[in-house]
Amino acid sequence: MKRSAHIAGYLFLFAFVAFSQSSDTALRMVTQKDRTSRTGDGKLSPLSAAEHLYRGKTYFDNRQFPESREHFYRILELYPSDESAAGALFMTGRSYYWERDYARAITYLDRVAREFPDTLYGREGLSFNGACHVRLGKNAEAAKIYEKYTVMYPDGERIDSAHLNIIDALREAGNYNDAKAWVEKTRQKFAGTGTETNALQALVRMNIHRGKWGEAEAAADTILQGATFAGSTTSIDEIKYLKGFALEKAGNKQRAMDTYASIGNNFSSYFSGLASDRLAKSGAKMHIPRPLTAKQRSDNPVMYRDEILQYTKKHKIDPRFILAIMKQESSFKANAKSPAAARGLLQLVLDTAVKYKDKAGFPNLQPDDLYDPRTNIAIASEYIAELKDEFGGLYEAIAASYNGGEDNSARWLNRSKPKEAGIFAAEVGFAETKNYVFKVMNNYRIYRELYNESLDRR
C-alpha cells in the first residue's frame, strides 16, 4: 500500500476513534438506551454490530472505558468475523492502555495485529503493542516489536516514530551500541528530514545520560551545522542549551556561558529562560529578557482568583502554575470540552476526576459537574498535588504528566540524568506533550513576572 493510502486510512481512523467527539447529549442518550437494553441477568441485549460499535465508541470517546468494553466484548462474542471486530479489538486494547493496564492491553493489541495485519487497526495494534512493552519496562522486547513494524510496514503511518522508538528502547535497555547503530540507520533512511534531526537529538540525549560530554557536544554540533528543524521535535534553542550543558559539565565554563548567551532571551522561548538562570548563577548579567508587551500582559489575566487560592494553599501549589495550565487547557472557558472528552477550566477527563472527587469533597460527581469552576479547580488541585509529590515539585514533569500521563512522565524523568529541568524537557517523547510543557512553563514564567504568589500584580 502506498504511503498516501496509509495516511488517508490513518486520518480516517483517528477521525473515527479519537477526534470525532461524542457530545454530552449523545452520551446521555446511549446511557439511557443501555439501561433498557439488558437481559434479565443484567447483560447487554444483542444488538447489531454497528449499534454495539456506535455505543461502545460513544463511551470510548468520553473515556467511560468499562461501559465501552461491554459493547466491544459483545461484538467479539456475537460477530467475530464482522469487520467491526478489528475496531472492537483495537479500542479494547487502547482502553486498557489508557487505564495503564498494559499487560491486558497487549492481549488485544497483539490479537488485532495478528488477525488483521492488512488493516490500519492491525498496524496501530502492533505499534501500541510496542508502546505497552516500553511501559512495562520490557525495552528489548519493545525494540523487536518496533523493528517488526519497520519490516512489515516500510511505508507505514508510524514508520518514522518506529525508528525513533527503537533508538530510545535500546538505550533504555542498556544496548547503547545497538542504539547508535539505529541512529545511523534512521539518518540514512530519513536524510535531510526532521526525523534525522530527531535521531541526532536522541544521540545527544543518550550521551548526556551517559556522561559522555564530548560526544554530546559533537552530536549537537552536527545538528547545529546543518540539520533540518522543520518537522522535528527539537529546536535550535534546545540543542544550544544541551550543548552548553555538556560543555559546562565537561568543565569548559566560558564556552558553556557563551553558548547559553547565544540563545535569544525572550518570554516565548522555554530554553532562553533556563539559559538566563544558568548565566545568572554564574554572575553574568547580559541575558536580561525584553520587557513584556502590552499583549502579553493582557493575555495573562488572573481568573477565578478566590477558588484558585483556596485550593492551592491547601497543598502548597504555586497558584500561578494553575493559571498557566488553565490558560493552556481552556483559555479560561469554563464550558470547554475537548475531543478527548476533557471538560472545564482545567480539562479534566472523567476517569481522572472520579479518582480524586472524594478528596476534593464531591463524592456524587457527575460528568457535567466538571463545567462548574469551583468543582473543576478543586479536583484538579488534588490531582496536581499528587503529581507534585510524585515528581518532587518539578513543574516540567507535572505539566508533562498532566498532558501525557504519569507513567510516561515518570519514564522520561527516570532517563533524565541529571534530573534537571532542561534535560527532562529534552527527554519528553511526545511532540504534543513537549510543546505543551513549553507553553505551560512559558505561561508560568510570565505569570511569575506579573504576579506574586498571592496573585497580586507586581
Name each model feature, range by range.
Residues R35-E51, S232-T234, L292-P301:
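TPR-adjacent "capping" and linker segments in tetratricopeptide-repeat scaffold/adaptor proteins
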Residues G42-L47, I75-A85, A113-R123, T150-S161, ...:
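Short solvent-exposed coil/turn linkers within tandem alpha-helical repeat scaffolds
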Residues G42-R74, L78, R94, W98:
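Alpha-helical segment of the N-proximal tetratricopeptide repeat
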Residues Y54, M91, F128, N165, ...:
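"A position-specific structural signal for the A-helix of alpha-solenoid helical repeats
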Residues R100, E124, L136, E141, ...:
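Catalytic glycan-binding domains that act on GlcNAc-containing polysaccharides
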